[in-house]
């Protein structure tokens, strides 16, 4: 059996290598053809425009960093072949799940393809050129520069495809410990090399980093891709609040990007920090508009209380604003309020705040997180007994009844387990209040309006409008219908068990009667 398993695992590993070679055979030619096409078109159009900050003239030219620059090509090739466990240790024979590694390999290929498509589209829409002339390099290093200049012209500046690919390669690395530190040092050196070999300006390198984060967010290792979220997402047409918020974020994104263009024209590179902040905010708010318009809370990729690096990198202006908004509106009442037996409502706590709550006389030992936009202190070192649960909901949007029902069931399980639970969102006034009110109505059978009024008496600032109460009513109907269906299934199961026992008993009695009759005869 062991030999058979080893043979199957080796065969799966060979298939992975063949799959990686197939991806490489498709992406390699496409990379060179599309990149050269964009550069040649810019040369024909005689592009002279460039985006460069004044301080970049102090960046030194370091010829030896061309070795790091070229090493990325080898890393891209190795990333498709699980290079000795650097990129996918679970793919080696005898280790891990080949099906999962095949999915990760395909996602990696999709990322590189999407990255190339977006990059070339940017090159065609916004052609720029490098504004300096690199000095001539002779000797051993000069050969590497000659190979580079043979296909790479001083165009294709924003975003930096080199930095974008480096971001994707770094995300695929699976090393740990000292080797991870060495790998990170290599990543840093390759990233710096695009500047010290005078191939890219700073704004192009930063744009490449942003593009890499965007691709990682759109095509994660696990979970639905952006295409799946768009296809399965709930349109904002049926939710006026989501529709209004999507338009507000879209307008804010347009305003930031317009000010970004206007600011560059007026201020030049003298206000680089402001320009970068406006550009980043425009991107973050534009993506937030998509989240509200179609994608839903799953697009923020929140897991175990935290947001992945790609989401933090892309959305940080929006996330920072959401956190500041939460702290500003709850500055006078940061403490949670007791609304039912072992159930409390409050804002999303910080780590220290949660530590104080856990050490208090109430002894909080569970957290139900309803805020899609705020990271939770899920790494709280309160021992293994502390329970974290989450059903992310969008701030300001009318929640889906299915999501409300899931949150109510999780709260009910925590309560039945004897947990003292803090139900939290950004302010502790809308999402948390709705879930707790539906849970109270579900448990007690009281009208939802009475449960909402009871929560509002305990937590100042609770305000649930008619649309949210209707969503709560729909969630309550779903929960009650499922409970009745579950009760019916349980009664049917008991009836079937009783029937089986009756049949067994009848058969046993018949057998005894036949045995007695045989003995009498």
Where are these regions (language model features)?
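Aromatic-anchored segments of alpha-helical transmembrane domains
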Residues: 32-33, 116-122, 185-198, 256-262
């Amino acid at each position: 059996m062991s030999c058979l398993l080893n043979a199957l695992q080796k065969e799966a590993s060979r298939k992975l290598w063949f799959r990686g070679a197939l991806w490489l055979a498709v992406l390699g030619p496409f990379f060179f053809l599309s990149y050269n096409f964009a550069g040649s078109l810019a040369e024909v159009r005689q592009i002279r425009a460039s985006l460069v900050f004044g301080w970049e003239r102090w960046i030194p030219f370091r010829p030896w960093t061309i070795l790091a620059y070229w090493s990325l090509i080898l890393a891209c090739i190795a990333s498709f072949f699980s290079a000795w466990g650097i990129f996918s240790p679970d793919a080696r024979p005898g280790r891990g799940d080949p099906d999962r590694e095949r999915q990760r390999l395909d996602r990696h290929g999709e990322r590189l393809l999407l990255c190339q498509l977006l990059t070339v589209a940017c090159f065609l829409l916004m052609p720029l050129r490098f504004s300096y002339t690199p000095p001539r390099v002779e000797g051993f290093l000069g050969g590497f520069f000659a190979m580079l200049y043979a296909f790479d012209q001083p165009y294709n500046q924003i975003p930096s495809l080199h930095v974008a690919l480096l971001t994707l390669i770094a995300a695929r690395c699976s090393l740990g410990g000292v080797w991870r530190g060495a790998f990170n040092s290599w990543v840093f050196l390759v990233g710096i090399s695009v500047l010290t070999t005078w191939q890219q300006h700073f704004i192009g390198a930063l744009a490449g980093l942003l593009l890499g984060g965007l691709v990682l967010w759109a095509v994660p290792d696990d979970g639905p891709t952006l295409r799946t979220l768009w296809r399965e997402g709930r349109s904002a047409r049926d939710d006026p609040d989501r529709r209004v918020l999507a338009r507000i974020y879209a307008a804010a994104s347009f305003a930031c990007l317009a000010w970004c263009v206007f600011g560059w024209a007026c201020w030049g590179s003298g206000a680089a920090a402001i320009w970068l902040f406006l550009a980043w905010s425009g991107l973050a708010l534009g993506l937030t508009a998509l989240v509200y318009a179609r994608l839903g809370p799953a697009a923020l990729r929140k897991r175990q209380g935290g947001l992945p690096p790609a989401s933090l990198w892309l959305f940080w202006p929006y996330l920072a604003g959401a956190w500041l908004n939460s702290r500003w509106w709850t500055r006078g009442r940061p403490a949670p309020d007791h609304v039912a037996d072992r159930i409390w409502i409050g804002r999303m706590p910080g780590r220290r705040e949660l530590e104080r709550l856990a050490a208090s006389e109430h002894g909080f030992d569970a957290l139900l997180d309803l805020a899609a936009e705020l990271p939770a202190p899920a790494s709280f070192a309160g021992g293994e007994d502390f329970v974290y649960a989450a059903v992310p909901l969008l701030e300001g949007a009318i929640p889906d009844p299915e999501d409300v029902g899931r949150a109510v069931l999780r709260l009910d399980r925590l309560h039945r387990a004897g947990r003292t639970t803090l139900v939290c969102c950004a302010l502790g006034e809308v999402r948390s209040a709705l879930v707790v009110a539906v849970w109270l109505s579900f448990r007690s059978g009281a009208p939802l309006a009475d449960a909402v009024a009871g929560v509002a008496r305990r937590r100042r600032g609770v305000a649930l409008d008619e649309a949210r109460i209707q969503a709560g009513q729909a969630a309550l109907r779903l929960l009650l219908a499922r409970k009745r269906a579950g009760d019916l299934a349980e009664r049917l199961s008991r009836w079937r068990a009783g029937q089986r026992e009756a049949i067994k008993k009848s058969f046993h009695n018949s057998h005894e009667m036949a045995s007695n009759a045989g003995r009498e005869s």
